Curated annotation (Swiss-Prot):
Free-text description of this protein's post-translational modifications in UniProt: Phosphorylated during mitosis.
Record's catalysed reaction(s): L-lysyl(20)-[histone H4] + S-adenosyl-L-methionine = N(6)-methyl-L-lysyl(20)-[histone H4] + S-adenosyl-L-homocysteine + H(+); L-lysyl-[protein] + S-adenosyl-L-methionine = N(6)-methyl-L-lysyl-[protein] + S-adenosyl-L-homocysteine + H(+)
Stretches with biased composition (Polar residues): 95-104
Top-level taxon: Eukaryota
Protein name, UniProt field: N-lysine methyltransferase KMT5A-B
Residue ranges of every copy of the SET domain listed in the record: 200-321
UniProt gene name: kmt5a-b
GO annotation terms (biological process): cell division; methylation; regulation of DNA damage response, signal transduction by p53 class mediator; regulation of transcription by RNA polymerase II
GO MF: histone H4K20 methyltransferase activity; histone H4K20 monomethyltransferase activity; histone methyltransferase activity
Major location (coarse): nucleus
Catalytic activity, EC: 2.1.1.-, 2.1.1.361
Role of this protein: Protein-lysine N-methyltransferase that monomethylates both histones and non-histone proteins. Specifically monomethylates 'Lys-20' of histone H4 (H4K20me1). H4K20me1 is enriched during mitosis and represents a specific tag for epigenetic transcriptional repression. Mainly functions in euchromatin regions, thereby playing a central role in the silencing of euchromatic genes. Required for cell proliferation, probably by contributing to the maintenance of proper higher-order structure of DNA during mitosis. Involved in chromosome condensation and proper cytokinesis.
Region (Disordered): 1-107, 141-165
């Protein structure tokens, strides 16, 4: 009697014949539970009504097909569980991507709404500023504030010492010369050379086919004074009379140079033999020198200036400028 409770006999139901999904938790045939197995959703209630003891011949075709699929899914075991896990992971990935797309669309909508609100608020502020004009009292107050600020700044500037460049460096005179000063110095130098009759940087030499000529003994830069064409300064009437007398003697050369000065025609007559070299410079249309008038105390002087850089040993040449037929007939070398 006191030996304990009697164990109830196990039921006659065959444990191997009933599906595992129906054994746990009672025999609830209408609502079978899943325990880690994949059950096809085609007709889930068919499995609970099927009995494994029935022969396949007595089953309908649909029941037979579902039972075969059910047994195959039970026999899969571990691969079926992995497939289910993969399906769950894929489902989670799709749901997360959907949530992200929904969130991004919501964020875009929120940003668009915030931008629209910003521009609307800005427009309202500008409208308010336009509508609310300053009163005369407010204008006076703002002007006073600006004046006070400017006065404060001026006071600060007065307090701070104004430093000059001379506080750090001593004043010194510039050594540079202006263009006018340089031109004035050059004129004074030429005046001195003309008045003294000094002729440096050249010598007289015999030129083949020409006779006497002048050769440079030093380099001359372009625009530099070379020599004066020295002779008698006479007016046009005297020049014509002398030229007629010189034409009677064929041995006399042509050393007369005509020019205009202050709307008046003058002539430099260098026919008389002197020791000056300017009168011996030969003619050439492509010479390396050209003539220029130089004024000394309102008296014109004819000088020769370098047209280009002249090297040592070059013959000094310039264009006489006489293109008259009579002159060319008398002196054919004027053509060159």
């Amino acid at each position: 009697m006191g030996r304990g409770k009697k164990m109830s006999k196990p039921g006659d139901g065959r444990s191997g014949d009933v599906p595992e999904t129906c054994r746990t938790g009672g025999t609830n045939e209408n609502h079978p539970k899943m325990n880690g197995e994949v059950v096809h959703l085609g007709q889930p209630k068919i499995y609970s009504y099927m009995s494994p003891t029935k022969s396949p011949s007595g089953r309908p075709p649909l029941q037979e097909e579902n039972s075969v699929a059910h047994h195959e899914s039970k026999n899969l075991g571990k691969p079926t569980t992995e497939t289910r896990k993969k399906a769950e992971v894929e489902k989670k990935r799709i749901s997360s991507a959907t949530e992200l797309s929904v969130k991004s669309s919501k964020q875009r909508e929120t940003e668009c709404n915030s931008i629209g609100e910003y521009f609307q608020t800005k427009q309202e502020l500008t409208d308010v500023q336009r509508n609310t004009a300053l009163t005369p009292v407010d204008k006076l107050q703002s002007q006073k504030m600006v004046k006070n600020k400017s006065q404060r700044r001026k006071a600060q500037r007065k307090k701070s010492p104004n430093r000059k460049l001379t506080d750090y460096y001593p004043v010194r005179r510039s050594c540079r010369k202006s263009k006018t000063e340089l031109e004035s110095e050059e004129k004074m130098r030429i005046d001195e050379l003309i008045q003294t009759g000094k002729e440096d940087g050249m010598k007289m030499d015999m030129i083949i086919g020409k006779g006497r000529g002048v050769i440079a003994t030093r380099d001359f830069q372009r625009g530099e004074f070379v020599v004066e064409y020295h002779g008698d300064l006479i007016e046009i009437t005297d020049a014509k009379r002398r030229e007629a007398s010189y034409a009677q003697d064929s041995a006399t050369g042509c050393y007369m140079y005509y020019f205009q000065y202050l709307n008046k025609t003058y002539c430099i007559d260098a026919t008389r033999e002197t020791g000056r070299l300017g009168r011996l410079i030969n003619h050439s249309k492509s010479g390396n020198c050209h003539t220029k008038l130089h004024n000394i105390s309102n008296v014109p002087h004819l000088i020769l200036v370098a047209s280009r850089d002249i090297l040592v040993g070059e013959e000094l040449l310039y264009d006489y400028g006489d293109r008259r037929k009579s002159s060319i007939e008398a002196h054919p070398w004027l053509k060159n």
